[in-house]
């Protein structure tokens, strides 16, 4: 038994490496209640101040936790299907070392959230339910990012070049280089490409039409307008406040040109392109945009005496980006995509200001599960925050408790923001939950749901 510094309870621990070199950690509290939570990021999360409190809380409630660290070669060899296999190996180890759990939950954030969703659809046999936080779905994500970045490249290049800041070719959005400029985790870049984009955004922001065009990119990409930390959440009926928020958000997004972790996603299929816009009608996308963003775009174009229809025509005439059939075959395999057909209950959370994964992916998932007749298996909740995966311990705890209530009774408890916030407070997890209504953040439908075949 190990007795660490508070707030961890006394626990037993097993650590090691799986056959592919992935590190793992298993912790079983002395007063284990039979529930096992698996998490892609448990091993690495133990040293992450934004995550460790959640794990402490789980153990304090009697839950065993088993999970991994992300593989050191993940930036070049990302494969969620292999990560799922690793989690089954981890469950084998757990059962051989301790005992068969009464219940197993798959829990995770970002890539771990994708793992949870994929398990619920394609590999549910050994898991009772999933809690997915800030989940990405690679092709969905790269396509929705491509839309906004394509608009930015087409409409903002003139400001960058016109100001003498560089050449049009500096503003790269796809087929990004493996030249060491990407962070080893696959998230974010340094060097000339993000620097060029920051300069382009600043140059465009100095012009009224440039500001309107930045807003158009956010609307067509279905990106959240408020993703920059330490900035106020803008009023949705204030076009100027929304535009300022989008500009600050664009500067943050510039650290991942073409979309968060694009290099990692492209590398997964031998560098082949997984996103495309060859069949996209951006005029139709504007009609389908979030109403507040669409109104802001129209207001800003009118204020700048800009030609919105002309810019849409310009987008229509610009050569598009095609996907590789090899890449799409890779991403179509079980475990690498989700289509909204869970076989077990799913509780999904997303932050409205997530800069890595727009909250609109969750809206697309909601539409998909309803269309597939799976709506009763799924509940979702939106959190008022910027960042990525920095969920409060209370938010994590109430999501798990909500899932357990569903498994124990067969019915979902109330998952309205008010009910979730109240139950989170009652759990006394040490911080406060920030669940919010979606009012004003809706879109008629998500543009980039991908169902292979």
Regions found by a protein language model. Name each.
Residues 1-453:
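C-terminal His-loop and adjacent cap/lid subdomain of alpha/beta-hydrolase
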């Amino acid at each position: 038994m190990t007795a660490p510094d508070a707030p961890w309870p006394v626990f037993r621990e097993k650590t090691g490496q799986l056959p592919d070199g992935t590190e793992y950690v298993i912790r079983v509290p002395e007063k284990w209640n039979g529930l096992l939570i698996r998490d892609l990021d448990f091993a690495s999360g133990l040293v992450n101040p934004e995550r460790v409190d959640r794990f402490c809380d789980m153990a304090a409630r009697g839950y065993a936790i088993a999970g991994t660290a992300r593989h050191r070669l993940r930036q070049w060899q990302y494969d969620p299907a292999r990560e799922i296999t690793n989690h089954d190996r981890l469950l084998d180890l757990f059962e051989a070392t301790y005992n068969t759990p009464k219940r197993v939950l798959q829990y995770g954030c970002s890539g771990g959230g994708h793992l949870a969703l994929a398990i619920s659809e394609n590999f549910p046999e050994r898991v009772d339910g999933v809690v997915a936080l800030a989940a990405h779905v690679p092709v969905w994500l790269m396509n929705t990012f491509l839309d906004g970045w394509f608009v930015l490249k087409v409409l903002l290049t003139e400001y960058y070049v016109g100001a003498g800041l560089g050449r049009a070719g500096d503003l790269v959005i796809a087929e990004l280089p493996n030249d060491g400029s990407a962070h080893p985790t696959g998230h974010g870049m340094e060097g000339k490409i993000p620097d060029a984009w920051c300069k382009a955004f600043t140059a465009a922001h100095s012009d009224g039409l440039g500001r309107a065009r930045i807003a158009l990119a956010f609307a067509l990409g279905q990106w959240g307008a408020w993703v920059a930390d330490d900035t106020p959440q803008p009023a949705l009926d204030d076009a100027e406040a929304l535009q300022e928020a989008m500009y600050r958000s664009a500067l943050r997004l510039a650290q991942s040109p073409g979309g968060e972790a694009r290099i990692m996603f492209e590398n997964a299929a031998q560098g082949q392109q997984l996103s495309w816009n060859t069949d996209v009608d951006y005029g139709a996308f504007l009609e389908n945009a979030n109403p507040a963003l669409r109104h802001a775009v129209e207001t800003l174009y009118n204020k700048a005496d800009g030609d919105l229809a002309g810019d849409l025509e310009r987008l229509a005439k610009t050569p598009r980006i095609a996907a590789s059939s090899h890449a799409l075959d890779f991403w179509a395999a079980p475990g690498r995509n989700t289509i909204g057909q869970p076989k077990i209950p799913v509780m999904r959370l997303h932050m409205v200001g997530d800069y890595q994964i727009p909250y609109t992916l969750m809206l697309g998932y909601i539409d998909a599960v309803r269309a597939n007749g799976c709506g009763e298996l799924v509940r979702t909740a939106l959190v008022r925050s910027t960042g990525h995966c920095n969920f409060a311990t209370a938010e994590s705890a109430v999501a798990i408790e909500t899932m357990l209530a569903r498994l124990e009774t067969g019915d979902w408890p109330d998952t309205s923001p008010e009910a979730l916030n109240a139950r989170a407070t009652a759990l006394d997890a040490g911080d406060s939950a920030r669940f919010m209504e979606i009012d004003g953040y809706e879109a008629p439908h998500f543009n980039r749901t991908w169902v292979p075949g």
